[in-house]
Amino acid sequence: GDSFQIMYGINGERKLTEEILPHLAGYEGSLPVRVGNAAYDQKQNDIFGYLMNIIDYYFLNFPGTVGEKEEMWEVVRIIVKTVYGIWRLPDRGIWEIRNEEKHFVFSKVMCWVALDRGVRVASYLKQPDYEVAWRKEADKIKEDIMLNGWNEEIQSFTQSYDSTHADSSL
């Protein structure tokens, strides 16, 4: 997970330190104007779901060479291994919360997406052992979401575990 970053500069920069430009005003005078992005080094567990969704689309729509499939399969295994290690941990979520990490339901859902798409890729590549193992872990994530992310009182999934705030991303 440490080798993955949630964003990069346009030229591939890894360090995107945020700074305020006090001499500038934004749209309709809004302040502060910032360059960079303080979230560049945040932990946002949802990114792996997006990556695996794209990889799944690739396998469905582009035949690729044997070598390309082998390279992509290696990437898939790395991503899934990363998700195994992080899905139980809090993160900053797509909301880029600056002050504390939480168990964001959307992040958990996207970790489930990552494993679900990993299962599909394993199926395409006829890797039944991975398919079975990854489905079991995906089912654990789903069970955790249903147990901790649903609030019976408001009849909705919430932004984070133990919250009463509905999440517009869900």
Region locations from a protein language model:
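Acidic, mature catalytic/reactive cores of soluble proteins
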Residues: 1-170
